UniProtKB/Swiss-Prot annotation:
It holds the Pfam family Toprim_4. Mg(2+) 2 binds at D219, D221. Its EC number is 2.7.7.101. RNA polymerase that catalyzes the synthesis of short RNA molecules used as primers for DNA polymerase during DNA replication. Also part of the exosome, which is a complex involved in RNA degradation. Acts as a poly(A)-binding protein that enhances the interaction between heteromeric, adenine-rich transcripts and the exosome. This is DNA primase DnaG. Keywords: DNA replication, DNA-directed RNA polymerase, Exosome, Magnesium, Metal-binding, Nucleotidyltransferase, Primosome, Transcription, Transferase. PANTHER family: DNA PRIMASE (PTHR30313:SF2). CDD domains: TOPRIM_primases. Belongs to the archaeal DnaG primase family. HAMAP family: DNA_primase_DnaG_arc. Residues 316-374 are annotated as: Disordered.
């Protein structure tokens, strides 16, 4: 008996007979007319006894004196032997007393059907029955490292602000933007970190900065700049470190983190860079907004000086209409003793007309200062250079110091930065600049100034590398760096518009680099 599990092929054939015949007649004709035809190895009776050939199935119908039907022969032989056996069936020309014809029309591969079922079932098992894949070695290491970092993460204050484990014990702390930044720094062993969670600085963090040496470490985008501005107003920081342009602290590797922290700058330079001005109090007298902890050292003993006038040397520059070059005067012309006490009142403004009437006032800038009765001394305000041939009247204001008196100071005149001429065609980018203001996003434009894609500024450099010739202009809410200029030049980009221009050494002649202020 043929085992269906071992069947490899099924021979499909059809029979036509001129007469009425039945199944036993057809089976007898198959065994009788093929006996001894193919030799002892392929004799159907022997093959059926050994299980190489299965049960022969016959399905016939008789109609109008003729018989038609199909014959199915299962085989576990190989392809060659099965083909020989199928061909031998077509040699049968008579069944009983009737003439007949057998024709093979298909050899079915049973294993192919099984393979299809196996594939379909395997797809179902793979998609629905595997809950999780086997992780790779790197994934296992990252998971263990991440769990250790999460265990080390602690919280500070009633607001449960995320921070590193050494924030309270360390003399110096690092302020970052979010929880992911703390986890990345913990990964490389930096544990004295605390986050602010955006531009809304928590009061606990502002109070903590008064007791520590603080370094603000922010992202290299406009959001990081806004956080620094907020910290300068509500907290007391000493240094500022920035991530590379377009990168976030949470994405930096160890080498980039160490390099950024080593390049930190004092907060005084940041105040000058961002142009943060001193605020005025309600009584219209200027007050000193902040004093750095590194410079605020209380003296041991300060003797009280009453009714005594001190002389202070102030630099004075002469203004000459003959030349426009900057030129320093001799030491005799740059020194003058000035002493005068000013009553505590609103700051005075000296108009240009009054300065024109007195030539001495147009040539010299005087700073008058009284001795404060407090240990904290007011810093001298150095006079700024005035270019020759460009005289201007200076505004005189009074700065209130803790001694109850006021000091008349002359603020340095603002530098006039020449703005490069902008072509009239560049004004067409103004709508894009206005739409992107404060969004930290970028627009990639084609030759018709149509928006191809709008992405985040942090992804701009990597995304521009994927474009080839269809990009002609880029407008973004960020700083134009040398790296962006080089990438834009390699992609034949003609216009690069940002918020401001960073340290750029060279710009291609066929590229126009503009800022939003120029438009």
């Amino acid at each position: 008996m043929q085992n269906t599990d071992t069947t490899k092929y099924i021979i499909h054939s059809k029979i036509n007979a001129d007469g009425v015949i039945e199944r036993p007649d057809i089976v007898g004709a198959i065994f009788g007319q093929t006996e001894g035809l193919l030799g002892a190895d392929l004799d159907l009776r022997d093959l059926q006894k050994t299980g190489r050939i299965g049960r022969i199935e016959v399905m016939v119908t008789a109609k109008g004196g003729k018989t038609k039907g199909n014959i199915f022969v299962p085989s576990s032989l190989d392809k060659v032997e099965t083909s020989i056996l199928a061909a031998s069936l077509e040699t049968i020309d008579r069944v009983g007393p009737c003439s007949a014809k057998i024709e093979v029309f298909q050899v079915e591969d049973v294993r192919a059907v099984k393979r299809k079922k196996i594939i379909e079932r395997a797809k179902l098992i793979f998609t629905k029955m595997f809950d999780e894949t086997v992780p790779e070695s790197q994934e296992l290491a990252d998971e263990v490292r991440q769990s250790v970092r999460v265990d080390e993460l602690t919280h500070y204050g009633k607001s449960r602000i995320p921070c590193g484990p050494n924030v309270l014990n360390s003399d110096a702390i690092i302020i970052v933007e979010g929880r992911a930044d703390i986890l990345n720094l913990l990964r490389y062993g930096i544990k004295n970190t605390i986050c602010v969670g955006g531009t809304n600085i928590p009061p606990e963090v502002a109070e903590l900065t008064k007791k520590k040496t603080v370094t603000a470490f922010t992202d290299g985008d406009r959001g990081g700049e806004l956080i620094i501005r907020e910290l300068l107003q509500v907290a007391d920081i000493d240094y500022v470190a920035r991530a590379p342009d377009g990168k976030c602290v949470e994405d930096l590797v160890q080498k980039e983190i160490i390099r950024s922290l080593r390049r930190k700058v004092p907060v005084e330079q940041i105040i000058e860079k961002y142009g943060i001005q001193e605020k005025e109090s309600e009584d219209s007298a200027c007050r000193l907004e902040r004093v750095s902890k590194r410079k605020m050292r209380a003296p041991e003993v300060v003797p009280r000086i009453a009714e005594k006038k001190l002389h202070k040397r102030v630099k004075v520059h002469r203004v000459s209409p003959k030349t426009e070059a900057y030129e320093e005067e001799s030491p005799e012309e740059m020194e003058e003793a000035v002493t005068e006490k000013i009553p505590e009142k609103a700051p005075e403004k000296v108009s240009e007309k009054s300065l024109e009437k007195t030539p001495a006032a147009a040539e010299k800038v005087e700073a008058r200062k009284a001795v404060p009765k407090s240990p904290v001394m007011a810093r001298p305000v150095p006079a700024a250079r005035v270019p020759r041939g460009k005289p201007s009247a200076e505004k005189v204001s009074a700065v209130k110091v803790p001694g109850g008196e006021a000091v008349r100071v002359s603020p340095a005149p603002a530098r006039q930065v020449p703005i490069a001429p902008v072509s009239p065609e560049a004004a067409r980018f103004r709508p894009h600049v206005d739409a992107l203001k404060g969004t930290l996003t970028a627009r990639i434009l084609d030759s018709d100034d149509k928006v191809i894609e709008e992405i985040a500024v942090r992804d701009l450099a990597s995304r521009l590398k994927t474009y080839r010739d269809n990009v002609k202009s880029v407008v973004f809410d960020g700083v134009i760096t040398q790296r962006l200029v080089d990438i834009a030049s390699s992609n034949a980009i003609k216009n690069l518009i940002g918020v401001k221009i960073g340290n750029i050494a060279k710009v291609p002649a066929d590229m126009e680099v503009l800022t939003s202020a120029m438009l």
